[in-house]
Amino acid sequence: PTSLGIIFFFFFDWAISPTHPEREERLLYTQDQFREEGLFDIEGISEHRPLRAENVDILRSHFCFPTVEAVCTESHRISAGGAIRAAQLVLEKQSQRAFALVRPPGHHAMKVVHGNRGFCNINIEAVMVEWIRSHYGIRRIAIVDTDCHHGDGTQDVFWHDPDVLFISLHQDGRTLYPGSGFLNENGGPKPA
């Protein structure tokens, strides 16, 4: 039988405004629906708590100005820790698949961080990739981003990395933030 580990975010110290589209109610509603529909009663589906990303985890993939503490709240650390926990579940064979439902989001945060871009302060996908590399020695990784917005930050972080395949499936950049993600954006020059 297949198994699926689901990680929910449980801290809510980060908010833009009560009416902003990126708000905690989105995830709370999803959590409620999962429970109401009995998702966790299905054999093979289990719920897990996220880990917490430490400074060393964040700094493997980011340059934070002026400091990590200046750009990250506890929520950012737990959100990145949710992605790390999903990877850990699969790589340690505790689950065949894992899905992290976490916020705040991350795929617009670039390698150099000095504030937020598209509601993203740190790139949780990049933090997870570098954590996998550090803890398991896996170099070649594929990321498939299925958000309606182009994952421009993830693209930026791994642009010059020949060992990361990043695919962003998104709405046309001419009609939606961040206005990028076109066919000619297909990787930087190979490192010397």
Residue ranges: model-predicted function:
Residues 1-133, 139:
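Metal-dependent C-N hydrolase catalytic cores
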Residues 84, 88, 99-192:
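Conserved alpha-helical scaffold segments that buttress catalytic/binding sites
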